[in-house]
């Protein structure tokens, strides 16, 4: 699933082609995504795109009339192509631009979303209760320590909770906990302040590094130019269950936590 770095890489890739460009058409070939594409989404036709932003794993395409909200789901991708480019399987939506280009949404598994919001997007049900962005000053050690106080859930599940902090999915939660030396099953409310400070720092550092590397390509993700990301080459634990720890040489353990694969080193991340 594309996580925050992959969505941010996509935003950076498509923004120069979208901002200040007029939308001439919205072609919906298959509206049956995670939620049906609403007819009202076509209100973007004739509008000039003012900005392209990211909130968590959502892309926000702003116009004077409203905002298109895009979620890549499990396997979605956005590419900028000449509008005349032949359609391939799973190319569900084209946002056609006056420049002759199109923003094409491809989603094999159809867990993505393409929605429209006329309200300030902060009021939209999908966005209104999201936690802070991890790469901003709002996500800091005192905040996280307070957010986790008295929580008995595993720290990894809390780190992946969008109400606590947005965009830290399974890949980067595994990596950040390893870097901070915290066992993923540790009770969140019992992790001490020193470890929380290290964890916040590692989350920021790992996400920033992943963005710089173009995201993580494991199977489906490509950027707006169709190129893969290279952060997978730097993964220490995710997807490496049963292999040796890059830090101590011990075999990495793999368990299911919240139905997600969780890999850790039982020596470097003691419970």
From Swiss-Prot:
Family per similarity comment: Belongs to the FPG family.
Q: Binding residues for DNA, per the UniProt record?
A: 90, 109, 151
Reactions this protein catalyses:
Hydrolysis of DNA containing ring-opened 7-methylguanine residues, releasing 2,6-diamino-4-hydroxy-5-(N-methyl)formamidopyrimidine; 2'-deoxyribonucleotide-(2'-deoxyribose 5'-phosphate)-2'-deoxyribonucleotide-DNA = a 3'-end 2'-deoxyribonucleotide-(2,3-dehydro-2,3-deoxyribose 5'-phosphate)-DNA + a 5'-end 5'-phospho-2'-deoxyribonucleoside-DNA + H(+)
Complexes and interactors: Monomer.
Report the Pfam families cross-referenced here: Fapy_DNA_glyco, H2TH, zf-FPG_IleRS
Instruction: Tell me the SMART domains matching this sequence.
Output: Fapy_DNA_glyco, H2TH
Q: CDD domains given for it?
A: EcFpg-like_N
Q: What is this protein called?
A: Formamidopyrimidine-DNA glycosylase
InterPro entries tied to this protein = DNA_glyclase/AP_lyase_DNA-bd, DNA_glyclase_Znf_dom_DNA_BS, Formamido-pyr_DNA_Glyclase, FPG_cat, MutM-like_N-ter, Ribosomal_uS13-like_H2TH, Znf_DNA_glyclase/AP_lyase, Znf_FPG/IleRS
Which free-text remark accompanies the cofactor? Binds 1 zinc ion per subunit.
PROSITE patterns tied to this protein: FPG_CAT, ZF_FPG_1, ZF_FPG_2
Active site residues according to the UniProt entry: 2 (schiff-base intermediate with dna), 3 (proton donor), 57 (proton donor), 260 (proton donor)
- Name the Gene Ontology molecular function terms of this record: 8-oxo-7,8-dihydroguanine DNA N-glycosylase activity; class I DNA-(apurinic or apyrimidinic site) endonuclease activity; damaged DNA binding; zinc ion binding
Listed under GO biological process in this entry are: base-excision repair
Which cofactors are required for activity?
A: Zn(2+)
What EC identifiers does the entry list? 3.2.2.23, 4.2.99.18
Zinc fingers (FPG-type), renumbered ranges: 236-270
Q: Which PANTHER family match?
A: FORMAMIDOPYRIMIDINE-DNA GLYCOSYLASE
**UniProtKB keywords:** DNA damage, DNA repair, DNA-binding, Glycosidase, Hydrolase, Lyase, Metal-binding, Multifunctional enzyme, Zinc, Zinc-finger
Out of the domains of life, which is the source?
Answer: Bacteria
């Amino acid at each position: 699933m594309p996580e925050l770095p992959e969505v941010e890489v996509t935003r950076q890739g498509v923004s120069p082609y979208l901002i200040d460009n007029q939308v001439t058409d919205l072609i919906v070939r298959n509206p049956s995504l995670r939620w049906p594409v609403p007819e009202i989404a076509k209100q973007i036709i004739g509008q000039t795109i003012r900005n392209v932003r990211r909130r968590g794993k959502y892309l926000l395409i702003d116009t004077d009339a409203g905002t298109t909200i895009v979620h890549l789901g499990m396997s979605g991708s956005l590419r900028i192509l000449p509008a005349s480019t032949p359609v391939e399987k799973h190319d569900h939506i084209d946002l056609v631009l006056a420049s002759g280009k199109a923003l094409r949404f491809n989603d094999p598994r159809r867990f993505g979303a393409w929605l429209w919001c006329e309200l300030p997007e902060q009021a939209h049900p999908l966005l209104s209760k999201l936690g802070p962005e991890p790469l901003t000053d709002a996500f800091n050690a005192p905040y996280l320590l307070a957010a986790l106080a008295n929580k008995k859930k595993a720290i990894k599940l809390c780190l992946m909770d969008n109400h606590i902090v947005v965009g830290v999915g399974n890949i980067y939660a595994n990596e950040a906990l390893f870097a901070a030396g915290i066992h993923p099953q540790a009770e969140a409310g019992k992790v001490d302040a020193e470890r929380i400070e290290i964890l916040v720092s590692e989350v920021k550092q790992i996400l920033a590094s992943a963005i710089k590397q173009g995201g993580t390509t494991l199977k489906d993700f490509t950027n707006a130019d169709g190129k893969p990301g290279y952060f997978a080459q730097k993964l220490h634990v995710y997807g490496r269950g049963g292999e040796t720890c890059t830090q101590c040489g011990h075999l990495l353990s793999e368990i299911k936590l919240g139905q997600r694969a969780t890999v850790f080193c039982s020596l470097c991340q003691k419970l």
